[in-house]
């Protein structure tokens, strides 16, 4: 996949400034196109990474009980409005066959998936599917909580409203007690 085209973004931002009635040569916004291009390269850096790559680092550990990394902060950009949404992801899995990954690898996977024009639902399911595919655990549960600026700044204008999405895979799909246990761990501060 091609890298971010900074010049093209700069040109587009100048056009947006003109389209809203601003002067792109005005002192306060003169460097805005360059700043926005640089920001987009960072914010959308996940476009050029395979999130599964982070999960391939495994440790041969005979642990087949729950592993939960909770409150992983993330930010993303709504693909519908190109405004931010941000929150936390909680990633739980039950390892199988000695395939335990580093805890930071779960956080890196979330970041890589989130750093692209995205939907919260897709982040949630892609994290779960990536873990299932690479680590082949007994089960996975991903819970994502986020506030969407497209609901805060425009439209319905409801600051503070949180959206919660879940993805459950493997043995956890049919184990309500295990899902409840994971949710209770997530709620515990």
From Swiss-Prot:
Keyword annotations from UniProtKB, A to Z: GTP-binding, Hydrolase, Metal-binding, Nucleotide-binding, One-carbon metabolism, Zinc
Catalysed reactions, as listed in the record: GTP + H2O = 7,8-dihydroneopterin 3'-triphosphate + formate + H(+)
Molecular function GO labels: GTP binding; GTP cyclohydrolase I activity; zinc ion binding
InterPro entries linked to this entry: GTP-CH-I_C/QueF, GTP-CH-I_N, GTP_CycHdrlase_I, GTP_CycHdrlase_I_CS, GTP_CycHdrlase_I_dom
Pathway: Cofactor biosynthesis; 7,8-dihydroneopterin triphosphate biosynthesis; 7,8-dihydroneopterin triphosphate from GTP: step 1/1
Protein's UniProt name: GTP cyclohydrolase 1
UniProt-listed Gene3D superfamilies: 1.10.286.10, 3.30.1130.10
Database matches in PROSITE patterns: GTP_CYCLOHYDROL_1_1, GTP_CYCLOHYDROL_1_2
Family: Belongs to the GTP cyclohydrolase I family.
Enzyme class: hydrolase
Subunit and partners: Toroid-shaped homodecamer, composed of two pentamers of five dimers.
Documented EC number(s): 3.5.4.16
An annotated GO cellular component: cytoplasm
NCBIfam families (alphabetical): folE (TIGR00063), PRK09347.1-2 (NF006825), PRK09347.1-3 (NF006826)
Superkingdom as given in the UniProt entry: Bacteria
Biological processes, Gene Ontology terms: one-carbon metabolic process; tetrahydrobiopterin biosynthetic process; tetrahydrofolate biosynthetic process
Binding site for Zn(2+): 78, 81, 150
């Amino acid at each position: 996949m091609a890298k971010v085209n900074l010049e093209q973004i700069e040109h587009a931002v100048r056009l947006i400034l003109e389209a809203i009635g601003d002067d792109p040569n005005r002192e306060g916004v003169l460097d805005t196109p360059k700043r926005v291009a640089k920001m987009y390269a960072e914010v959308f850096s996940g476009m050029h990474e395979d999130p599964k790559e982070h999960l391939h680092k495994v440790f041969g550990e005979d642990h087949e009980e729950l592993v939960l990394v909770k409150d992983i902060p993330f930010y993303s950009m709504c693909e519908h409005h190109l405004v931010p949404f941000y929150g936390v992801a909680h990633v739980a899995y039950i390892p199988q066959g000695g395939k335990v990954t580093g805890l930071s690898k779960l956080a890196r996977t979330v970041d890589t998936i989130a750093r692209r024009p995205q939907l919260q639902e897709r982040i949630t399911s892609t994290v779960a599917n990536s873990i299932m595919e690479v680590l082949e655990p007994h089960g996975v549960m991903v819970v994502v909580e986020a506030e969407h600026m497209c609901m805060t700044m425009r439209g319905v204008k409801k600051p503070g409203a949180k959206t919660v999405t879940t993805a459950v895979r493997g043995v956890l799909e049919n184990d309500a007690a295990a899902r409840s246990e994971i949710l209770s761990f997530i709620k515990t501060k």
